[in-house]
């Protein structure tokens, strides 16, 4: 079985290794090493091999987090990655206070940044720092995966 320089099993898009009868998913490969990713890869492999419904995983829409204080969450492209890949981008930043902090009289704030493809208005990245950022970014990943437009965000009534 062929390995990468770091010792991971090399696989193709169907999770097949260099030996046709050996497949690999999860942390033994050189893809994103997160439990939910390994589970999704296992489902995709089983569906393709045994269920007759091949599916792919969009590795570009997997949220990531740093569980620090304050926590950080991100999904999609950074501003720099978007500029390199797409050319012109727009960014929008804002801070806000979660309702639980408003009601408690606390001044804890979060900062978020949207990265938008200038040509299509598509939100290609969302980044956040502040309380509950990782949990919030899990839901935001749906917006990036669904290729929502900045106009969709603007048209949404906030709580």
Language-model region placement:
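Short, flexible active-site loops
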Residues: 25-31, 59-68
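Flexible, glycine-rich terminal cap/loop adjacent to redox cofactors
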Residues: 50-53, 62, 67-159
